[in-house]
Every structure is written in structure tokens, then in C-alpha cells.
Curated annotation (Swiss-Prot):
The lineage of its organism: Eukaryota, Viridiplantae, Streptophyta, Embryophyta, Tracheophyta. This is Probable cytochrome c biosynthesis protein. It holds the Pfam family Cytochrom_C_asm. Keywords: Cytochrome c-type biogenesis, Mitochondrion. GO terms for biological process: cytochrome complex assembly.
Amino acid sequence: MSIVELFHYSLFLGLFVAFTYNKKEPPAFGAALAFWCILLSFLGLLFCHISNNNSNYNVLTANAPFFYQISGTWSNHEGSILLWCWILSFYGFLLCYRGRPQSHNVSKRGGYRETFFYFFVLNFVKNFILSLLCYEQKTLAVPQLYTPFVLRTLVDSELCSRRNRTFDGPALFYAPLYPERKMSFAFLGARLPVVRGEGKRTYLLLHLARDDKERASSIDEQRIDGALGIALFFSFFLLASSDFFVRNFFVCTEPLAELNPVLQDPILAIHPPCIYAGDVASAMGFCLCRSKMMNGIVALHSPPMWKDAAEKNGRLLCSAGCVGFRITSELFTLKFKDVGAKCYPALLLRSNRSPLMLLRRRFFAFSLLWTGALVDTGREQAKRVVRNGKKDTATSPLSWTAGANTVVSDQDQEPIRIWILTCWCFLNVGILLGSWWAYHELGWGGWWFWDPVENASFMPWVLATACIHSVILPLLHSCTLLINIVTFLCCVLGTFSIRSGLLASVHSFATDDTRGIFLWRFFLLMTGISMILFSQMKQQASVRRTYQKEMVVARSTLVHLRHSARAQPRPQLLWKN
């Protein structure tokens, strides 16, 4: 085996390491191994260009001086995709090393953490798994009705729908009503037992569903999953349709073609890596936003948080000064319009039965809310949480859920701000260098009638500029997540347009329609997943706003109860079950 083949197989080694590294090691360990393996493959391609190894097809068709031989490594389709993968693996390593997740060891609930690419690979092998169902049904085996990805999706859907009990899917598992109870799910008709012992390895397809505490500790791993999942796709795309170590079937001592003289420019040699670095940084921001949406959808409606919120609201009602005993959470979690069916609050005291008195006090309660008597307390508490990112576990006494303030803390949106600034800076440098090249190579008109391929990098720059103005806000809004997602999707769309033949240019890579099909499917997949997650997040946000309206009415009643208690300290009958 030659040294060139060793460089070729190092890319396979990087993918293998990402799957099978020891789970007792931190996630940065596996990301570092994948980074060094891809770097070795990239250095091998660079060595082929520098040494004029004419056995490689890309070297044979791109003869140039020494400096442009180095830049010729990424001046073709195969080398540019390999550079993309290497930068993405490097960014993933930085994310792992900076995050330093502390929950990489064995879980207390049993089972090891999943591998980096586990959930992402299931998207690609889902069709293959479903194709096995026909074979199992023909052989009279128990059919597997659901893939792990579908099961995990149903688990999250069950957690989101625990409030209204409107889950229409199969009852795969029952979510616990209390945090101390374990929750798990298994395959329908699975023949392997689930290992429930602590510290033992659990079969991947029969893993335990995590509660809110364990889900919060795995946020860092979910961020890394998305980044290395994108690297996985581009690696498979590179090996399937864009092999960068294509060998010639004949011996040749001299190159057959020269590199395009228009591309032999020192500015244009530095321009592509800057554009790729900016595009890959947008991919990291996309992964962070995807992780935030996936965790936010489940966290806002998990049963333990609803129980904690109910207890806090009950203590708030007790502190109003009109209740002499503790109110249970089951009583307060009922809808406010149904409270009157089971209890008689202080609104029905004998001294307060006058409709005019009720109307006057209700108006007085709403006026207090309008002036900020109760809302200001929640705002000040939220400001303290947002300004101090380290204390992200603090919650407002008037918040509707225990996890509402932790979602919008500065500590959570700091990585998004860093990566979107990185994307914007690299795109700035790349676009300025490309504009300079177009000016002195194509004339003054080249500055305005720019190359259409370079315009593909201008769309992400505009969106990144808009995202910078949105991410500097103290709270992380949904528009920030949407702009981050669309920025990465524009990068993928620009890559597809360049490498599929939609845009004709001097340095386009349109040589095969198969590459465009791969990239188009990847673009549709990322767009579909992003829109589904974003729509679910907005749906949960609308439920939250509806619940907040109910809480406004409840808090106004608390103000009325306080004044009623002052008017009559000892009521005859306050609550009746």
C-alpha cells in the first residue's frame, strides 16, 4: 500500500473513530481524533500537489507554479469539499473543548451516552431499516414497527402533550408524573431485554428515555451531534461522488493541462478558505440553534417542571395573605375557569357579594397589574437572571415554569453570538478579497458585474449581518434562531448552485449532476427538519402565551384576595372541596 492510499483511508478512519471511540472519554477526545484523521487526509492531498504526483487525476490536470500548487488543493471540487470537512471537524473540536461537558461518564440512570453520529445516521439508514420489515413479515418474525428515530420523536411528542393528554400515537411508554420515577420505552416486539442496572451498557436501540435533569446535562452532546452530523454527510458525499484520490490508469510524467491563468492570483488563493470558514461557522450556529429548539420544546412542558411551577404558584397564593393552609398543586394546576366548580374563593364572601363591589375590586386588581405592581417583580427577577449568565438556574417566583428563565440566559446565547460573528468576519474578508480580485482582473465593471458564483456568498453575509443585530439583544428571540437557520440554509443553497451547474462561472465545479442531487436532497432534509422544529417551538410558545394570559387573570384575583382578606380577616368559609 502506497502512502497516497494511506492518506485516502485516513478519512475512513476518522469516520470509524467518531463511531467507536471509548465513551468513558470526554466528547472532545472523539472530536480530536476525527479532526486529526481528516487533517492527515488533507495533508496527503496537499503533498500530492506539491510533489507533482501525476498518478492523481487532479494533479495531472492542474499544472501551476509552486504557490498555486498549494492553492490548487482547494481550487477543485474534491479538495474544496475536503477542506470544508476539515474546517468543520476543527470547529467541532473547538466546540467540544470550549463546552467541556461534565456528563460524559456513565449515566446514573443506566447506559452510556450515545455516539456522536447516532441520531444523524438513523435519518439515513431509516429507509434501510424499514425495508427489513418486509423480510421479517415474510419469515413470520415479530415486526419492528418503529425505528429508533421515530421512537425518540414520539417520546418527545409525548412529553410535549402531557398537559392536554391528546397524544394520538401508540402508547409506547408512560411519562412519569413525578421526577423520582424512571421512565423508559422499548421496541414493540423487541426480543432483547433492556438492561436497567446502573453502570451497565444499554443496547442502543433500547436506551432509556431521559428525564429533565439528564436531558439538560446532554445539551452539549446534542450541539456536537449536529456539527459532526453535517461533517458525516459531507464525508459520505466526498467518498461517494467526489473521490479526491482518483488514480490514473496510465503512467504520465508531465501534466496534461495548466491551471486557469485567471485563477492564478494570490488574492484568489486566499479567498476560498475564508468563504469556506464563514460557511462552516454558520453550520455551527445552525447546530446550536437546532439544539436549543429541541431542548426548549421538551423542557417547557416536561411534567416535573409543571409540578414545580404548580407548587410555586401555590406558595404564591398562600403568600397573598388570604389562605391559612397550603394549597395542593393538583388544585392550582386546574384551568382557572374550572376552579369555581370545586372551590369557593374569597370572591363569594358574604360581605363581598355585591356585583358593584366585585366589579370595582376586579377593576382595581387589573389597574395594579397595568401599573406593574406584580409584573415588575417578575421583570426585575428576569433581568437578574439574564444579566448574570452563571446563575442560570434561578427562576422568577412569578414565572409560569421552572425552565423559562434558563432558556433565555446569556450563557446559552453566548456560543451563538460567537459563531455568527466568526461567520460574519470570515465572509467579510472573503468577499472583500473576491471584490478586489474582480476589480483588478476584470476591470472596473467587474466590481459591479461580479462573478455569479461569488454572489452565493453574499446571501449568507446579509443574513449574518441581520443576525448580529438580533443576537446582541439581552433575550434570545425566535427570530434570532430563524435567521441563524436560514443563514446556513443559504450556504447550502449556494454550494448546491455552484456544484450542480445552475450558475456558470470561471471557477464553478459543475462536472457531474449526481453531486447536485446529493446536495439538493441534503438541502431539503435540513430545511424540513428546521421548519418542523421551528413550527413546534412557535406552537409551544403560543401555548405559553395563552397560559400567561390565564396567569394574568389568576394574579389579578390574588390581588383581589389580598384586599378581601384585609377587609375581612376571618372569613367563615374560604375553600370548599
